[in-house]
A protein has these predicted regions:
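Alpha-helical transition-metal enzyme core signature, strongest for iron centers
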Residues: 13, 47, 51, 84, ...
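A generic "alpha-helical surface" signal
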Residues: 4, 11, 45, 78, ...
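Core of compact, soluble alpha-helical bundle domains
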Residues: 1-64, 139
Length: 141
């Protein structure tokens, strides 16, 4: 696991969400014949891939960086795992639809599961930033 894998996964999921906001605003009834149609599926696929094993990557980062006290970090692992799993299920459900309309994406954007996940990611990414900075400083010093 690279030191920035959590950050990379967070960015992939956030980029998908931002693209979905734009896609939802287009008022498309389906995803055929639109340049955005292939893109929305690709963004969703990448987000789904980033979600796979996300909690395990977080746990490995806590362990490899010896974050102390470990208990609060590991307790949050259950929250992240639940929210990532629910979001992945929702994304996979949308990917199974043909076509993917703007309204469907708007409903996915409004999903409490996806919103909870995004909040989790913002929190985890922000907490890990000082850890990345300290790790980088230790390597270059």
């Amino acid at each position: 696991m690279s030191p920035d894998e959590i950050s990379t996964r967070c960015a992939t999921i956030e980029e998908c969400y931002e693209f979905m906001l734009a896609y939802a605003g287009q008022g498309l009834t389906g995803d055929e014949g639109s340049h955005a149609s292939g893109e929305v599926r690709e963004f969703l696929r990448r987000a789904a891939q980033a979600l796979l094993g996300l909690a395990e990557v977080y746990a490995a980062a806590v362990k490899s960086r010896n974050l102390q006290p470990a208990e609060p970090y590991l307790a949050y692992l259950a929250v992240l795992e639940k929210d990532a799993g629910a979001s992945l299920a929702a994304i996979q459900l949308v990917l199974a639809q043909n076509p993917i309309s703007s309204q469907l994406i708007d409903n996915l954007n409004a999903s409490i599961h996806l919103r909870a996940l995004l909040t989790d990611l913002f929190l985890v990414d922000e907490i890990m930033k000082p850890q990345r900075t300290q790790a980088s400083g230790a390597i270059t010093a």
